[in-house]
């Protein structure tokens, strides 16, 4: 009887220890950064032509099989704001609250667009790099090669080890922003048309 009692206590003790050892997978202990990709439903671009002042919103729905067509005119300048949504709720503030843990990379694989980050202090990281929630685009050539798709691949990275606002030529286009490490919080694809 003592052995059964002793074994039961031992098994219960081990189960208790194992249950304490297991924790849920959370990328950060900071509650301000609870922004898992599964909770982002839309990535919106608010594109405002500087010449007209008229904004147009392009809505990429996460996991969609179709991409919004962003109409850009060669020679025009646009102010662009990225807005992240979770259903009807604006999740952009959560990214600003955890700005040191986020960074946007803009990839224009078949366009000649000069991008400048224009974030204010609310979305500028502690290392001085701007997250990229607000940008200015100067469109030199929206579609460089008409026989190939032109698009924007916009990626939000979480907890990158290093970031840079530098640009690099990539194939027939330009990538704005580089990073090492981290995870993808969201990726949105937009077709570029003119």
Locations of the language-model features?
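Bacterial Sec-dependent N-terminal signal peptides
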Residues: 2-3, 17-45
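Bacterial N-terminal signal peptides that target proteins for export
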Residues: 1-12
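Extended, polar beta-sheet/loop recognition surfaces of beta-rich domains
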Residues: 27-30, 91-131
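Short beta-strand elements
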Residues: 168-194
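Short, solvent-exposed beta-strand/turn "edge" segments of beta-rich domains on protein surfaces
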Residues: 34, 67-76, 143-144
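Internal, hydrophobic beta-strand segments that form the core of beta-sheet-rich folds
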Residues: 79, 84, 144-173
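A beta-strand/beta-hairpin structural motif
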Residues: 60-66, 118-144
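N-terminal edge beta-strand
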Residues: 47-73
């Amino acid at each position: 009887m003592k052995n059964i009692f002793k074994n039961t206590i031992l098994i219960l003790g081990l189960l208790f220890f194992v249950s304490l050892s297991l924790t849920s997978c959370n990328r950060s202990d900071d509650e301000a950064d609870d922004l898992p990709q599964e909770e982002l439903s839309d990535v919106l671009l608010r594109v405002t032509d500087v010449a007209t002042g008229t904004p147009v919103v392009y809505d990429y729905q996460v996991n969609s099989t179709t991409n919004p067509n962003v109409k850009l005119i060669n020679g025009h300048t646009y102010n662009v704001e990225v807005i992240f949504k979770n259903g009807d709720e604006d999740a952009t503030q959560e990214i600003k609250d955890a700005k040191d843990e986020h960074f946007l990379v803009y990839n224009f694989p078949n366009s000649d667009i000069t991008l400048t980050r224009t974030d204010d202090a609310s979305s500028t990281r502690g290392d001085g790099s701007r997250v990229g929630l607000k940008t200015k685009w100067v469109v030199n050539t929206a579609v460089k090669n008409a026989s190939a798709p032109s698009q924007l691949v916009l990626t939000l990275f979480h907890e990158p080890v290093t970031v840079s606002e530098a640009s690099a030529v990539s194939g027939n286009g330009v990538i704005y922003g580089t990073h090492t490490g981290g995870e993808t919080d969201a990726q949105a694809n937009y077709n570029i048309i003119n």
